[in-house]
Amino acid sequence: MHMRIQKLNSDTKKNLLEDLLKRSPNNYGQYEASVKEILDKVKEEKDAAVFAYTAKFDGAELTADTIEVTDAEIEEAYAQVDDTLLTVIRKAKDNIESYHAKQRQNSWFDSKPNGTILGQKITPLHRVGVYVPGGKAVYPSSVLMNVMPAKVAGVDEIIMVTPPGKNGKVSPNTLVAAKEAGVDKIYKVGGAQAIAALAYGTESIPKVDKIVGPGNIYVALAKKAVYGHVSIDSIAGPSEILVVADETANPRYVAADLLSQAEHDELASAILVTTSEKLAHEVSDQVDGFLKELSRAEIISKSLDNYGYILLADTMEDVIDVANEIASEHLEIQTKNPFEVMTKIRNAGAIFIGEYASEPLGDYFAGPNHILPTNGTAKFFSPLSVDDFIKKSSIISYSREALQKVHKDIESFAKAEQLTAHANSIHVRFEEED
């Protein structure tokens, strides 16, 4: 198959943006009733509902004695994991931990000679729930990316949920990654029922303060539904890559990077925006060549048919404009002056600069988080970070002398808003002086 090559203009841009928005989890209202039923059932029946849904959807029979992963199961997992993979998991964990450690914030206080103390107190969340997908694809990298920022932030307790196989077991790779990352408890439950258990609590699974981690449409809608009852990270949509390139880019590298995202699922988007017609055709040819060698060629072909684009722009300014409008989850810059282009990018989840910063480098190993905003939400959301696992409390302390100097100003403000009890709360401290 050949990727479609189109001239970038107002019509093609409009059609592209409309196509991408169709992939949003907000457009799956037909699933909401099913999700609500699951949430309500778990809220009411707790463990019994969790066990029933796990049997129905995953084919695994769980009890209060088997829902939590045991130390023996973790030891068994280590025996099954390849030594090379274990070494790589540990290296990646160190990189992720080192990167996120730089995001730490300290509490601060600003004191004045007049007795005024203002500040901000940083407090880690108490308990966090991490959702890790299961099924055919197993993602130990997602375990590390969700857990390490929470560990760096100082979260007291990290609970992980992940769906079991029909044998009632969890992938060894997932268990080993969880142990290496420092997860405190692991439960064999997935889907909307897992989100409900974390949000409301059951006899076996404790209620958490925040839920993070990607999942299918049922998980996404369940997270959306419990938001406000608990905090969540974001509503993850299908994966996206946008490559910005000029005539200096290597077409083989660009094609390989586009395919690396198209293989996720049929809703994934892979887009090249370039000023070079020669590169556009070469990339399309390279995609055809690679497809013959790849194990997920059928998924990739459907993904590219639906959401694969090569757009030809007149100028690099046009390329940058459309990149900022798309606000892609992953943005690669393969141009003559990539850092110069980077300074003009306002909207992107993660920015990969230069031809050797391939997107999978960020997925697995470099250190920055791979939990990124999708569906254009990079215009206002950020990657998962240490900030997602802390709270900030304002600190205010005034001496009598400090308050005395401003109390009439405060009273005037309160009276202007007709909040006389507010004014009185200040006035009563100085009423003997008036």
Language-model features: locations:
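Conserved small-residue-rich beta-alpha loop and adjacent elements
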Residues: 110-176
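C-terminal core of ALDH-fold dehydrogenases
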Residues: 325-434
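Conserved NAD(P)+-binding/catalytic subdomain of aldehyde/semialdehyde dehydrogenases
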Residues: 182-253, 257-260, 264-269
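Short loop-to-beta-strand entry elements in the cores of soluble alpha/beta enzymes
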Residues: 212-214, 234-245, 261-284, 300-311, ...
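Short internal beta-strands
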Residues: 156-166, 270-276, 354
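N-terminal Rossmann-like NAD(P)+-binding subdomain of aldehyde/semialdehyde dehydrogenases
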Residues: 1-126
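Alpha-helix C-terminal capping segments
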Residues: 145-156, 179-181, 199-205, 223-225, ...
